[in-house]
């Protein structure tokens, strides 16, 4: 990379850090181009991204954005995964890492909280925002359905009694 290109690359990483409250730092050594492409496409469908970064530039960007706490995670062949939705991103990356041993989760940051590999795996077990919304709606609808069932029960029981009496005669 030319010296003149480095400030632009740092600015790109700074923008990612500023716009994405959720970042996972990974090592991608040994992943094939097709595997990286599959991961990028999967992340893109979840409005997330995957960017291979030069460690020194990623550290400079981290220091410029006040994310000094993650600067020590940048060593080796590093790529960052970034998103606005931490749980969906974590699920996708953890599942991809399980299927592809060459992707290693190093750590990350979610809403300025530094996470280690174990914490990211635990995060991936949580429900996503859409799953939580669905569950809450289901819980809110359940009592109404039960009330309707209770109110309809006497009339349906009465109808069965009348039907049984009519069929005897």
Swiss-Prot record:
Keywords: Ribonucleoprotein, Ribosomal protein, RNA-binding, rRNA-binding. One of its GO terms (molecular function) is large ribosomal subunit rRNA binding. SUPFAM superfamilies: Ribosomal protein L10-like. GO terms for biological process: translation. One of its GO terms (cellular component) is large ribosomal subunit. CDD domains: Ribosomal_L10. The keyword Cell membrane does not apply. It comes from the Bacteria. Pfam families: Ribosomal_L10 (PF00466). NCBIfam families: PRK00099.1-1. Part of the ribosomal stalk of the 50S ribosomal subunit. The N-terminus interacts with L11 and the large rRNA to form the base of the stalk. The C-terminus forms an elongated spine to which L12 dimers bind in a sequential fashion forming a multimeric L10(L12)X complex. Belongs to the universal ribosomal protein uL10 family. Forms part of the ribosomal stalk, playing a central role in the interaction of the ribosome with GTP-bound translation factors. This is Large ribosomal subunit protein uL10. It comes from Rickettsia rickettsii (strain Sheila Smith).
């Amino acid at each position: 990379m030319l010296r003149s290109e480095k400030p632009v690359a740092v600015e790109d990483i700074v923008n990612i850090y500023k716009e994405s409250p959720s970042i996972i730092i990974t090592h991608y050594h040994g992943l094939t181009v097709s595997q990286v492409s599959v991961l990028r496409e999967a992340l893109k469908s979840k409005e997330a991204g995957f960017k291979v970064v030069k460690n020194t530039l990623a550290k400079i960007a981290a220091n410029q954005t006040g994310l000094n706490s993650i600067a020590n995670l940048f060593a080796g062949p590093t790529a960052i995964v970034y998103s606005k939705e931490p749980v969906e991103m974590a699920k996708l990356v953890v599942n991809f890492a399980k299927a592809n041993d060459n992707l290693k989760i190093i750590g990350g940051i979610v809403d300025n909280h530094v996470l280690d590999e174990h914490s990211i795996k635990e995060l991936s077990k949580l429900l996503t925002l859409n799953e939580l919304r669905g569950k809450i709606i289901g819980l809110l609808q359940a009592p109404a359905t039960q009330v309707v069932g209770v109110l309809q029960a006497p009339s349906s029981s009465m109808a069965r009694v009348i039907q049984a009496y009519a069929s005897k005669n």
